[in-house]
Amino acid sequence: MKDPIDLYMNTLVPMVVEQTSRGERAYDIYSRMLKERIIFLSGPVHDGMSSLICAQLLFLEAENPSKEIAMYINSPGGVVTSGLSIYDTMQYIRPKVSTLVIGQAASMGSLLLTAGEKGMRFSLPNSRVMVHQPSGGYQGQATDIMIHARETEKLKRRLNEIYVRHTGQDLETVEAALERDNFMSAEDAKAWGLIDEILESRNRPDDTAK
């Protein structure tokens, strides 16, 4: 059975037609946004998404290493290692990466949200953010289960250190906050240091200037 989200994304993505010196050229909407240095991180985080996001980041760096990249996030989270590959690429490249949550940034999504450039991490007013510790289920021999449990504990410590680095909270505060699912409003996320500003609207031209 096909994933209904994949089916939707593959069949209902709008196309944008532009006039060029060589005639008309059609882009899917996400490719057109990429031309404006906007990346959409939407849906669960997994290896396939990670590869696409990292490739877009590296492409935009190669195109202009000094111009800002904007990342719009609406994600429930997902695979930790996939998310960390995106995180590492964000820190590795030369352009500053601005992050903006639209909808939700949960689990690994919240880590990628706070990984944006300091002062350039934003939320729309009704977005939700959720932080928690990593989880996983394993089966097999008892020894293998213990090995996986130790690895999960190492990942937990590493993720906590990343939140400490980007939020300014101390380790004890982060550990307590991530012990269980911890949902935050945009205001809570700002107070906790996950984001820097809440954006309600873009700057609009003065109505009298029409």
Curated annotation (Swiss-Prot):
Q: Which Pfam families does the entry mention? A: CLP_protease (PF00574)
Domain of life of the native organism? Bacteria
- Name-wise, this protein is ATP-dependent Clp protease proteolytic subunit
- Active-site residues per Swiss-Prot or TrEMBL entry: 107 (nucleophile), 132
Cellular localization per UniProt: Cytoplasm
Keyword Nucleotidyltransferase in annotation: no
Phylogenetic placement of the source organism: Bacteria, Pseudomonadati, Pseudomonadota, Alphaproteobacteria, Rhodobacterales
Query: Which class of enzymes does this protein belong to?
Result: hydrolase
Which organism is the protein's source? Cereibacter sphaeroides (strain ATCC 17023 / DSM 158 / JCM 6121 / CCUG 31486 / LMG 2827 / NBRC 12203 / NCIMB 8253 / ATH 2.4.1.)
Q: How does it assemble?
A: Fourteen ClpP subunits assemble into 2 heptameric rings which stack back to back to give a disk-like structure with a central cavity, resembling the structure of eukaryotic proteasomes.
- Do you know which NCBIfam families this protein is assigned to? PRK00277.1, PRK12553.1
Family the entry assigns? Belongs to the peptidase S14 family.
- Which PANTHER family does the annotation name? ATP-DEPENDENT CLP PROTEASE PROTEOLYTIC SUBUNIT
What is the E.C. number? 3.4.21.92
Ranges in coiled-coil conformation: none
Instruction: Cite a single GO MF annotation.
Output: serine-type endopeptidase activity
Sorted alphabetically, which InterPro entries does this protein's record hold? ClpP, ClpP/crotonase-like_dom_sf, ClpP/TepA, ClpP_His_AS, ClpP_Ser_AS
